[in-house]
From Swiss-Prot:
Pfam families: ubiquitin
Gene3D superfamilies referenced in this protein's UniProt entry, alphabetically: Phosphatidylinositol 3-kinase Catalytic Subunit, Chain A, domain 1 (3.10.20.90)
Designated gene of the protein: UBI1
Protein known as: Polyubiquitin
SUPFAM superfamilies documented for this protein: Ubiquitin-like
Length: 229
């Protein structure tokens, strides 16, 4: 089958693969086409970094799926983290560091537990499993640190197939944020998701608290067919 690999420069590479191919195999094919050594390649699908020993079918990668290729840069860089008190912290990081890693570095410097940290860049809240390069955070970028006063909560999302997904959210999360979290877990694009709670379809710009969605509430996920109404 054919799959596509999109690079950060926007170039798209087409590969011939089989479902049983491992991620290592795919990286070798990319090396054959593009000359990039496998150890410098990170492949992302549905917000997840793909592990070398696993196969395409393990990740439910099907024909004409698009993977994203991020290069692991050698050597580190400095970034800045600005707190609400106006203090600026300097961190030594690598592009391949995850947001969790960055929060741990902040904990080492400032003693703030990672679960109380929210990091913002370009107006977006950064998610733990993603990397700095996923968000195009480069040397000398400035992140903003906001403290989570109350912890988050769990909610459930039930699909039409009967599967239930558990999400970590905050009352202040917008419906868009929730759809992004579902995309990270399930690979379903937000524009194909409709979320229903208490018989109402939820609108993107509104928050969970707007709809009185509390901990352990269950939302229902309905898929929008392409070309539908």
């Amino acid at each position: 089958m054919q799959i596509f690999v999109k690079t950060l420069t926007g170039k798209t590479i087409t590969l011939e693969v089989e479902s049983s191919d491992t991620i290592d195999n795919v990286k070798s094919k990319i090396q054959d086409k593009e000359g990039i050594p496998p150890d410098q390649q990170r492949l992302i699908f549905a917000g997840k970094q793909l592990e070398d020993g696993r196969t395409l079918s393990d990740y439910n990668i099907q024909k004409e799926s698009t993977l994203h290729l991020v290069l692991r840069s050698r050597g580190g860089m400095q970034i800045f983290v600005k707190t609400l008190t106006g203090k600026t912290i300097t961190l030594e990081v690598e592009s391949s560091d995850t947001i969790d890693n960055v929060k741990s570095k902040i904990q080492d410097k400032e003693g703030i537990p990672p679960d109380q940290q929210r990091l913002i860049f370009a107006g977006k809240q950064l998610e733990d499993g993603r990397t700095l390069s996923d968000y195009n955070i480069q040397k000398e970028s400035t992140l903003h640190l906001v403290l989570r006063l109350r912890g988050g909560m769990q909610i459930f999302v039930k699909t039409l197939t009967g599967k239930t997904i558990t999400l970590e959210v905050e009352s202040s999360d917008t419906i868009d944020n929730v759809k992004s979290k579902i995309q990270d877990k399930e690979g379903i694009p937000p524009d194909q998701q409709r979320l229903i709670f208490a018989g109402k379809q939820l609108e993107d710009g509104r928050t969970l608290s707007d709809y009185n969605i509390q901990k352990e509430s269950t939302l229902h996920l309905v898929l929008r067919l392409r070309g539908g109404f």
